[in-house]
Amino acid sequence: MPRAKSSVVSRNRHRKILKLAKGYRGSRSKLFRVANQAVMKGLFYAYRDRRQKKRDFRKLWIARINAATRMNGLSYSRFINGLKKAGVEVNRKMLADLAVNDAKAFGQLVELAKSKLA
């Protein structure tokens, strides 16, 4: 059986990595070993941050809701508790959007939560 050489496979693998590293600065887009490390790290960051993004946005929404509820004389946790008791099922994304774009409607929700807490 003849010896199988890996030149075609290696070249294709190198080409694939260097294509992924296109746009990187310096040797990170030119040299295979450095480019491979940069691409692997980039893919790791992308994977990790797709999950992190969900947590970051939830934190942002909670901070916005908290700021708006405190302007209306209520804390975030008591506001959420009041909404749960009132049976209002609006998610935090929508609450944050209301707090930023429609303060009047958000104020009505705060008053509803206050009435259910009292």
UniProtKB/Swiss-Prot annotation:
Q: Which PROSITE patterns match?
A: RIBOSOMAL_L20
Any one of the GO BP annotations: translation
Q: Does the keyword Transmembrane helix apply?
A: no
Q: InterPro entries recorded for this chain?
A: Ribosomal_bL20, RIBOSOMAL_L20_CS, Ribosomal_protein_bL20_C
Q: One MF term in GO for this entry?
A: rRNA binding
Q: Does the record carry Nucleotide-binding as a key word?
A: no
Cellular component GO terms, alphabetically? ribonucleoprotein complex; ribosome
Report the superkingdom from the record: Bacteria
Cite the entry's keywords alphabetically: Ribonucleoprotein, Ribosomal protein, RNA-binding, rRNA-binding
Which family would the database say this protein is a member of?
Belongs to the bacterial ribosomal protein bL20 family.
The protein's matches in HAMAP family, at most eight in alphabetical order, are given as: Ribosomal_bL20
**UniProt cross-references to PANTHER family, sorted A to Z:** 39S RIBOSOMAL PROTEIN L20
User: Which NCBIfam families is this protein grouped with?
Assistant: rplT_bact (TIGR01032)
Q: What function is annotated for this protein?
A: Binds directly to 23S ribosomal RNA and is necessary for the in vitro assembly process of the 50S ribosomal subunit. It is not involved in the protein synthesizing functions of that subunit.
Protein known as = Large ribosomal subunit protein bL20
